[in-house]
C-alpha cells in the first residue's frame, strides 16, 4: 500500500459515519417547509401569472400576455415595430414554426426568421453582427421570482438566448409553478438532470463600484416574455404547475 492509499485509509477511518436516514430526513424537512409556506398563500393560476409578470417587470423585462390563437401574430407585429430584421429561432418546435409562419404571412419582407443550423465557427461574425433577436421556448417558470426555466438543446442552444441583444422567450401559462421547489418536485428533476439548465429572471445587467447599472454587458440588454394562456393544452401541465 502506497503513502497516498494509507493517508486516504486513515481519513476514511476517522470520518464520522452519516446515518443512512440523514438525506431522507433533510428532504422531508425541505418538503414540509415549502408545502407549509405555499399553503399559507395558495395562488390560483391567474394569480401566478400576475405574480410572475410583476417580478419580471420589476427586473426591467417586458411581459406580453396573449392567447394561444393570437400570440404569434401579435409578436410578429411587435418585432417589426421594434426594428428587428433577423430573428434566430428553433424552426423544429411547434412554437417556432407558428412564429415563422406568422412572420411570413404578415411581414414577409420585414423580419427574416433564421434557424440555428450551422456550427458557430462557420458564422460567428454574422451571428454577432446581424442577428437582432433570439426566440426560445421556456420549459416552465417560477412565479415567486419571475424566473424562466430554459433547457438549451441542439436546435436552440444557449447562444440563442445569450448573444442577440433582444431575447424573446415564450412560456405557456400552464407550466408556471409557485416556486423552485414546486418545479423541481412536479417536473421530477432528480430523474433526469440536464447538463445545461438556464434560469433567466430579466435582461443581462451589471453594476460598477459606483452602483451604476448597465444592461447588456454580458448578454441581452432586453427581455420580452410572451405568456401564452393555453387552457387548450389539457390538464396535465396545469396540474403539474399547480403544486
Q: Language-model segments: which ranges?
A:
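The feature marks the mature, well-folded catalytic cores of soluble enzymes
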Residues: 1-243
Amino acid at each position: 500500500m502506497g503513502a497516498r492509499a494509507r493517508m486516504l485509509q486513515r481519513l476514511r477511518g476517522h470520518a464520522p459515519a452519516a446515518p443512512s436516514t440523514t438525506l431522507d430526513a433533510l428532504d422531508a424537512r425541505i418538503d414540509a417547509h415549502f408545502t407549509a409556506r405555499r399553503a399559507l398563500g395558495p395562488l390560483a393560476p391567474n394569480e401566478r401569472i400576475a405574480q410572475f409578470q410583476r417580478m419580471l417587470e420589476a427586473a426591467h423585462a417586458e411581459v406580453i400576455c396573449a392567447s394561444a390563437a393570437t400570440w404569434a401574430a401579435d409578436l410578429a407585429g411587435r418585432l417589426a415595430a421594434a426594428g428587428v430584421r433577423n430573428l434566430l429561432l428553433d424552426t423544429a418546435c411547434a412554437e417556432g414554426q407558428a412564429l415563422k409562419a406568422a412572420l411570413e404571412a404578415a411581414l414577409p419582407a420585414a423580419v427574416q426568421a433564421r434557424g440555428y443550423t450551422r456550427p458557430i465557427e462557420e458564422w460567428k461574425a454574422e451571428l454577432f453582427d446581424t442577428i437582432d433577436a433570439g426566440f426560445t421556448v421556456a420549459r416552465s417558470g417560477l412565479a415567486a421570482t419571475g424566473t424562466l426555466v430554459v433547457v438549451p438543446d441542439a436546435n436552440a442552444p444557449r447562444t440563442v438566448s445569450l448573444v442577440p441583444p433582444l431575447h424573446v422567450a415564450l412560456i405557456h401559462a400552464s407550466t408556471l409553478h409557485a416556486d423552485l421547489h414546486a418545479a423541481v418536485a412536479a417536473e421530477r428533476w432528480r430523474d433526469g438532470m440536464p447538463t445545461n439548465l438556464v434560469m433567466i429572471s430579466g435582461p443581462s445587467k451589471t453594476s460598477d463600484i459606483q452602483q451604476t447599472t448597465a444592461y447588456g454587458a454580458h448578454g441581452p440588454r432586453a427581455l420580452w416574455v410572451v405568456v401564452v394562456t393555453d387552457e387548450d393544452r389539457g390538464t396535465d401541465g396545469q396540474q403539474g404547475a399547480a403544486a
